[in-house]
Amino acid sequence: MRKGLTLVEVLVTLVIMGIAFAALLTSQLANLRASAQARFATDAKAAAVQVLERRSAEVLKSEIVPALSPYKDAPLDPDNPSGNWRSFYFVDYYFSCPTRVAPSPKQRGGSVANLRPGLTCSGTETIFGIPVAWDIRGENGILGEGVVTVVVTATHPRGPKVTLGRRVTCYDVYPSPTQDQPAPCPPPGGGRP
């Protein structure tokens, strides 16, 4: 009667254990890869959100200008049109991006010269080492009247790509409970051609 294991039995046991450990290792590596890709996608989304918020805030920005400014949109005091006015960057972006077109005659005198010069409609920023391309466009047609679309695409160097968009309307800029058509909104039929 023999005691112990034969060499063949030991080798078979080692092969079975090796296969089990290889399967476990492969599973762990797949999980690590998936976790890393998810983290990269999260980083890309964080960068995209940061640029989207910054560009949206630029479109929503307004400032106080004197009555003689070509950029005036709405008087601060309707009873005193020679006083200060509010100027909405929304109007500039809507009629300048992607190409400059004349605003409606009721806005900025209908002149391209009354739109702020030098607005950038697209570009690329790098956030956390992730390049983020952005694009601002005034929509055209009846469904696009008074709508500016901001789209950003972040592409992580290690793979994931995230695209986010936001539609900013003239009502986001100047929500007026007393007017059907607040100052930054083009009049019906007065949007981009």
Swiss-Prot record:
Tree of life domain: Bacteria
Residues spanning the membrane: 5-25
Proregion residues excised on maturation: 1-4
SUPFAM superfamilies, A to Z: Pili subunits
Listed InterPro entries: N_methyl_site, Pilin-like
Keyword Transmembrane in annotation: yes
Gene disruption: observed consequences: Mutants have a wild-type piliation phenotype but are deficient in transformation.
Modified residues (N-methylleucine): L5
Broad class of the protein's primary localization: membrane
Compartments in which it is found: Cell inner membrane; Cell outer membrane; Periplasm
Membrane topology according to the record: Single-pass membrane protein
Presence of the UniProt keyword ATP-binding in the record: no
GO CC terms in record: cell outer membrane; periplasmic space; plasma membrane
Keyword set, alphabetical order: Cell inner membrane, Cell membrane, Cell outer membrane, Membrane, Methylation, Periplasm, Transmembrane, Transmembrane helix
NCBIfam families, sorted: IV_pilin_GFxxxE
Function: Plays an essential role in natural DNA transformation but is not required for pilus biogenesis.
Protein name: Pilin-like protein PilA2
